């Protein structure tokens, strides 16, 4: 375990609440907190047993009571950071919590940097980097499904998979080294070794690519699906948004162009976090405010994972509808034929040629379940398993791509009968790329950058 100074930070969300927790970690954690703790009957903290709690008060330099607290003690390495850790349970609230923290710092602790507690857990070998990143994913999870996926990663399932792949890469390198040593000793080379190396590289590349194939689904589970609702004004976009949200979030009127700006909301679609974007229409307009909304709509369409095109079945297709269809036709889309509860007037060969059509009444809710099923079919083949090993982090995906590309390079070298020691350069690069995922191979600056994105107190 590495030697660090003692750090402290508020571990709970800042604001009014029943209880707040101040976390203190480091070799002097107990000694520092003891300086400002007064237990019942004069008891201090120096004789506290690990994994127990003690009731008392926090006091300032004038021996005045700051707050009533319960203090717990976790002895390293059996703690989150693998260091001695003290947690002060005090009353919630900005003033009370900050007052306790200020006195902990006065007593000798340093204010922790964002993510520094988790960083210490990583540097002390308690967790690897992918597990550390999963901690933040647990905190930011928007649905139970994304929570389960993050929990699976935090328990080391992905780490185990990556470590197994690294072992296979090391075995390939050992085989290459064995063959190269034979050549250097002027012994007759074993002609079966290049064949075995090639087979192993192909197998390893296949496993790496299988993980890459999970990345798109994994990213959607972690970050959510970006879905844009688009259509001409008053086609029912806001009504659809409200139907999906089960509340009147958007203004619904008979006046075209009422939604003048982009409206964004999150919904839980059977465990998938979906960021719904209700846009202004994209018609030509002279209204300056509406024109800004139209430009924002086009930006959101270009950024979206899925476009929901709404058409009004109670009206004929017009030029504005055709303009929208032309704009979104090369993207992944679903066509909602809205207002089927009214007399149908929509009839067009253009519409007939569109894919993924669903009849809907946003007003009555008819067709909403069909829409949800279609979304799952398009992105998850109809089923989702958050407990299987999958790649949810873009950094991990990029590292896997580099590993796969280097294994491609190794395979090309083998096919061209290049020297095995040249092939080993590609395999070594693949090994390092895989190591970046768990932190086994990573520059210190990048490690610092990753943990800097964490919240304080974690």
From Swiss-Prot:
<protein>
    <recommendedName>
        <fullName>tRNA modification GTPase MnmE</fullName>
        <ecNumber>3.6.-.-</ecNumber>
    </recommendedName>
</protein>
<dbReference type="InterPro" id="IPR027368">
    <property type="entry name" value="MnmE_dom2"/>
</dbReference>
<feature type="binding site">
    <location>
        <position position="126"/>
    </location>
    <ligand>
        <name>(6S)-5-formyl-5,6,7,8-tetrahydrofolate</name>
    </ligand>
</feature>
<dbReference type="InterPro" id="IPR025867">
    <property type="entry name" value="MnmE_helical"/>
</dbReference>
<dbReference type="Pfam" id="PF12631">
    <property type="entry name" value="MnmE_helical"/>
</dbReference>
<dbReference type="Pfam" id="PF01926">
    <property type="entry name" value="MMR_HSR1"/>
</dbReference>
<keyword id="KW-0547">Nucleotide-binding</keyword>
<keyword id="KW-0630">Potassium</keyword>
<feature type="binding site">
    <location>
        <begin position="234"/>
        <end position="239"/>
    </location>
    <ligand>
        <name>GTP</name>
    </ligand>
</feature>
<dbReference type="InterPro" id="IPR006073">
    <property type="entry name" value="GTP-bd"/>
</dbReference>
<dbReference type="GO" id="GO:0002098">
    <property type="term" value="P:tRNA wobble uridine modification"/>
</dbReference>
<dbReference type="InterPro" id="IPR027417">
    <property type="entry name" value="P-loop_NTPase"/>
</dbReference>
<feature type="binding site">
    <location>
        <position position="87"/>
    </location>
    <ligand>
        <name>(6S)-5-formyl-5,6,7,8-tetrahydrofolate</name>
    </ligand>
</feature>
<dbReference type="InterPro" id="IPR005225">
    <property type="entry name" value="Small_GTP-bd"/>
</dbReference>
<feature type="binding site">
    <location>
        <position position="255"/>
    </location>
    <ligand>
        <name>K(+)</name>
    </ligand>
</feature>
<comment type="function">
    <text>Exhibits a very high intrinsic GTPase hydrolysis rate. Involved in the addition of a carboxymethylaminomethyl (cmnm) group at the wobble position (U34) of certain tRNAs, forming tRNA-cmnm(5)s(2)U34.</text>
</comment>
<keyword id="KW-0342">GTP-binding</keyword>
<feature type="binding site">
    <location>
        <position position="23"/>
    </location>
    <ligand>
        <name>(6S)-5-formyl-5,6,7,8-tetrahydrofolate</name>
    </ligand>
</feature>
<comment type="similarity">
    <text>Belongs to the TRAFAC class TrmE-Era-EngA-EngB-Septin-like GTPase superfamily. TrmE GTPase family.</text>
</comment>
<keyword id="KW-0819">tRNA processing</keyword>
<keyword id="KW-0460">Magnesium</keyword>
<dbReference type="GO" id="GO:0005525">
    <property type="term" value="F:GTP binding"/>
</dbReference>
<feature type="binding site">
    <location>
        <position position="234"/>
    </location>
    <ligand>
        <name>K(+)</name>
    </ligand>
</feature>
<dbReference type="GO" id="GO:0030488">
    <property type="term" value="P:tRNA methylation"/>
</dbReference>
<dbReference type="InterPro" id="IPR027266">
    <property type="entry name" value="TrmE/GcvT_dom1"/>
</dbReference>
<feature type="binding site">
    <location>
        <position position="258"/>
    </location>
    <ligand>
        <name>K(+)</name>
    </ligand>
</feature>
<keyword id="KW-0963">Cytoplasm</keyword>
<comment type="subunit">
    <text>Homodimer. Heterotetramer of two MnmE and two MnmG subunits.</text>
</comment>
<feature type="binding site">
    <location>
        <position position="259"/>
    </location>
    <ligand>
        <name>Mg(2+)</name>
    </ligand>
</feature>
<feature type="binding site">
    <location>
        <position position="458"/>
    </location>
    <ligand>
        <name>(6S)-5-formyl-5,6,7,8-tetrahydrofolate</name>
    </ligand>
</feature>
<keyword id="KW-0479">Metal-binding</keyword>
<dbReference type="GO" id="GO:0003924">
    <property type="term" value="F:GTPase activity"/>
</dbReference>
<dbReference type="InterPro" id="IPR018948">
    <property type="entry name" value="GTP-bd_TrmE_N"/>
</dbReference>
<feature type="binding site">
    <location>
        <begin position="278"/>
        <end position="281"/>
    </location>
    <ligand>
        <name>GTP</name>
    </ligand>
</feature>
<dbReference type="GO" id="GO:0046872">
    <property type="term" value="F:metal ion binding"/>
</dbReference>
<keyword id="KW-0378">Hydrolase</keyword>
<feature type="domain" description="TrmE-type G">
    <location>
        <begin position="224"/>
        <end position="380"/>
    </location>
</feature>
<feature type="binding site">
    <location>
        <position position="238"/>
    </location>
    <ligand>
        <name>Mg(2+)</name>
    </ligand>
</feature>
<feature type="binding site">
    <location>
        <position position="253"/>
    </location>
    <ligand>
        <name>K(+)</name>
    </ligand>
</feature>
<feature type="binding site">
    <location>
        <begin position="253"/>
        <end position="259"/>
    </location>
    <ligand>
        <name>GTP</name>
    </ligand>
</feature>
<dbReference type="GO" id="GO:0005829">
    <property type="term" value="C:cytosol"/>
</dbReference>
<dbReference type="Pfam" id="PF10396">
    <property type="entry name" value="TrmE_N"/>
</dbReference>
């Amino acid at each position: 375990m590495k030697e660090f100074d003692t750090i402290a930070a508020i571990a709970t969300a800042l604001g009014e609440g029943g209880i707040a927790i101040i976390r203190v970690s480091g070799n002097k954690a107990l000694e520092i907190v003891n300086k400002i703790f007064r237990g019942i009957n004069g008891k201090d903290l120096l004789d506290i047993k690990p994994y127990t709690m003690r009731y008392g008060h926090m006091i300032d330099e004038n021996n005045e009571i700051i707050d009533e607290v319960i203090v717990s003690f976790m002895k390293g390495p059996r703690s989150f950071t693998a260091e001695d850790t003290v947690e002060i349970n005090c009353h919630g609230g900005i003033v009370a919590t900050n007052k306790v923290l200020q006195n902990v710092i006065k007593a000798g602790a340093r204010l922790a940097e964002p993510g520094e507690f988790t960083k210490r857990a990583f540097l002390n070998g308690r967790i690897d980097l992918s597990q550390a990143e999963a901690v933040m994913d647990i905190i930011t999870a928007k649905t139970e499904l994304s929570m389960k996926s993050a929990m699976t990663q935090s328990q080391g399932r992905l780490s185990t998979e990556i470590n197994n792949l690294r072992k296979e890469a090391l075995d390939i390198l050992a085989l290459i080294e064995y063959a190269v040593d034979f050549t250097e000793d002027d012994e007759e080379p074993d002609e079966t070794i290049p064949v075995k190396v090639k087979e192993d590289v192909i197998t390893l590349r296949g496993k790496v690519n299988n993980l890459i194939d999970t990345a798109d689904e994994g990213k959607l589970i972690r970050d959510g699906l970006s879905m844009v609702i688009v259509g001409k004004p008053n086609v029912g976009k806001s009504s659809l948004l409200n139907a999906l949200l089960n509340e009147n979030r958007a203004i619904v009127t008979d006046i075209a162009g009422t939604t003048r700006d982009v409206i964004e909301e999150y919904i839980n679609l059977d465990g998938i976090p979906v960021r719904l974007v209700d846009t202004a229409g994209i018609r030509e307009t002279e209204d300056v405010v509406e024109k800004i909304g139209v430009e924002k709509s086009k930006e959101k369409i270009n950024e979206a994972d899925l476009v929901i095109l709404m058409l009004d079945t109670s009206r004929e297709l017009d030029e504005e509808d055709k303009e929208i269809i032309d704009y979104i036709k090369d993207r992944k889309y679903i066509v909602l034929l809205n207002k089927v509860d009214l007399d149908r007037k929509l009839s067009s060969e253009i519409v007939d040629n569109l894919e993924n059509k669903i009849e809907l009444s946003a007003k009555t809710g008819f067709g909403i379940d069909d829409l949800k099923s279609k979304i799952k079919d398009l992105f998850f083949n109809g089923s989702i398993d958050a407990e299987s090993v999958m790649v949810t982090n873009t950094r991990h995906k990029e590292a896997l791509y580099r590993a796969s590309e280097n294994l491609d390079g190794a395979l090309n070298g083998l096919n061209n009968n290049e020297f095995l020691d040249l092939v080993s350069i590609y395999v070594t690069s693949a090994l390092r790329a895989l190591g970046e995922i768990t932190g086994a191979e990573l520059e210190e600056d990048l490690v610092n950058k990753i943990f800097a994105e964490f919240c304080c107190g974690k």
